[in-house]
Design a protein with these regions (language model features):
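Membrane-embedded hydrophobic alpha-helical segments
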Residues: 17, 429-434
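Transmembrane helix-loop junctions at the membrane interface of multipass transporters and ion channels
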Residues: 413-428
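Substrate-access "cap/lid" subdomains that shape
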Residues: 271-318
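Juxtamembrane or sensor-core-proximal signal-transducing alpha helices
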Residues: 434-450
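C-terminal, active-site-flanking charged/polar segments
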Residues: 353, 358, 432-439
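Non-transmembrane functional regions of envelope-associated proteins
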Residues: 2-284, 320-410
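Helix N-cap / beta->alpha transition motif
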Residues: 254, 308-311, 426-428
Length: 450
């Protein structure tokens, strides 16, 4: 008799079992629910549509038109120097390159001249006029030096590079080291720890760096990595703002460019026991998750930011004030030579424009983030709603219960346009907490940070 009573289902028991089941699902975070959450976030982006940018960012694209007029990619370093010199004339405040020059430029003329000079030295042939001519010719033929000179003259260029994340077994035999004199803007100016344990928090840690050759790296004002890690469905929604390498903390290209744009404002990283607590760039606060990843508030589909063809810039066919006082990002967008990304707006999206969205989001301080209290709120919602559904609703007549649920659906579920007005930020809807009540609005996950 006691066993029968124990196993007899009641509203309270059903509620407790439901709460337990949903709590376990919430804790385990199964893939299908995570993917569903990500897709609902994408739907919210589409519903919100395009939003106004700061107008501080412009893109110079190495596109099909540029390749048709100036030749196939990769371009000689002299061509890139011409492009940078043109942007200086247009008075761009900062020029960021979504490009890495990791190897010396292939130059047959330079090799021939260097070989001739070496042969003269071996044969002990002396001719001052010939030696002077060869030295000048070698200097002129050294396209790496030509680009480096252009970078140094501009005093506004920030370079890109990237990290590899090999396992120890897959590391190359000769591990490339970051140059000791890598521009300091590549790292955080200050890293502050809340405790000794905070110094050991796991972050994205690279094992190999693909950096620019020294002659070019030393001439720039800074350098930032352009690594981007897509979500499990292949869509880019987040960007890592800090990567650890050889006991130093490096910043993304977007942050390095912004730092130069904001007159070298200090870049500060605060670490706590749980991970990244805070990132600040001068007076700008940048919310991230514990891994140091920022959720990108995409301004819209591709070409939301003004695009200009590199060949038009070189040939002076761009309006005079197109780049004045602005951040200019340079990178490839021609089919076959650029990194294709999938974003909530487009399945084909240039990686160059991802960096533009990150920069504009930070400048406008219009972030998408999940407050720390949301997890507690979700658990409380699971418990409260589970008890309501298991105890109160069974006591309500079926007719009135059905009407009440229908009414709650229309009352608590406004149309998507009202969920995401332009002045509000998007949060990540948590599907598992909604399971305990099919009609729960997810408005509580929207967070505003103005």
């Amino acid at each position: 008799m006691i066993l029968k009573r124990f196993f007899r289902l009641s509203g309270l028991k059903i509620a407790l079992l439901s709460i337990l089941a949903v709590s376990v699902i919430y804790y385990l975070d199964p893939d299908f629910l995570s993917l569903l959450e990500l897709k609902t976030l994408d739907l919210r982006f589409h519903s919100r549509g395009k939003i106004v940018t700061t107008g501080e960012v412009a893109l110079v694209a190495i596109d099909e038109k540029s390749l048709d007029e100036l030749g196939r990619w990769p371009w000689p370093r002299v061509r890139m120097a011409q492009l940078l010199d043109a942007l200086v004339k247009y008075e761009a405040k900062v020029v960021g390159f979504d490009i890495v020059w990791a190897e010396p430029d292939e130059n047959s003329e330079l090799k021939s001249l260097s070989a001739l000079k070496q042969k003269m030295n071996e044969l002990k042939l002396t001719n001052r006029d010939l030696e002077k001519y060869l030295s000048q010719a070698i200097q002129k033929a050294d396209t790496d030096r030509t680009l480096a000179d252009s970078l140094a003259r501009s005093r506004r260029a920030v370079l890109g590079y990237f990290f590899h994340f090999f396992t120890k077994e897959d590391l190359p035999k000769e591990k490339k080291q970051l140059p000791k004199d890598l521009p300091p803007l590549s790292t955080y100016n200050w890293v502050k720890y809340s405790s000794q344990a905070a110094a050991k928090v796991p972050l994205f840690e690279a094992t190999y760096a693909e950096v620019n050759i020294p002659v070019i790296a030393e001439a720039a004002e800074g350098a930032g990595y352009f690594n981007i890690f897509p979500d499990r469905d292949g869509t880019v929604r987040w960007i890592p703002l800090v990567i650890k390498y050889q006991d130093k903390h490096y910043c993304a290209l977007s942050l390095a460019v912004l730092q130069k744009f904001l007159n070298n404002s200090p870049l500060v990283l605060r670490l706590a026991e749980f991970g990244v607590e805070e990132i600040r760039l001068g007076d700008l606060f940048i919310p991230t998750n514990e891994e140091g990843r920022m959720l990108i508030n995409y301004r819209g589909p591709q070409k939301t930011f003004p695009h200009y063809s590199a060949t038009d810039v070189i040939h002076g066919r761009v309006p005079a004030k197109a780049f004045k006082g602005k951040i200019v990002l340079v990178g490839a967008t021609a089919m076959g030579i650029y990194d294709i990304r999938v974003t909530p707006f487009d399945h084909v999206f240039p990686g160059l424009e991802v960096h533009a969205n990150v920069i504009d989001t930070i400048l406008k301080q219009q972030f998408l983030y999940r407050p720390n209290w949301v997890t507690l709120f979700d658990l409380l919602a699971i418990i409260v709603l589970g008890l309501i559904l298991g105890i109160i609703l069974p006591k309500v007549k079926a007719l009135w219960g059905g009407l009440d649920r229908d009414f709650s659906f229309f009352r608590l579920r406004p149309d998507l346009q009202s969920i995401i007005p332009e002045t509000r930020d998007l949060g990540e809807p948590d599907v598992s907490s909604i399971q305990s009540c099919p009609y729960l609005s997810d408005d509580h996950r929207l967070s505003i940070h103005d």
